[in-house]
Amino acid sequence: MNKTKQTEQKEIGRVKLGDTQDLVVSIVDNEKLDLRIFVKTDSYTGATKRGVRFYLFDNNWTEFKKLIDEVDKTYQELA
């Protein structure tokens, strides 16, 4: 019998993108950051393939945070 490891996913928060879409941020297996679009329509409710997942502990988090800081800086300059 094949045993597959269950994925543990903990939602951190979400941002409403529209009437039927949210951006959901989760930690997966205590080692990966997942940013995923979730939809709620008459025909489907749940995660889509649109999103990104990366490991937190191989310097990706540091680089991603720097990128978010740059986005925030640019946003502040535009506002």
Label every model-predicted segment.
Residues 15, 27-30, 71-74:
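Compositionally biased, intrinsically disordered low-complexity segments
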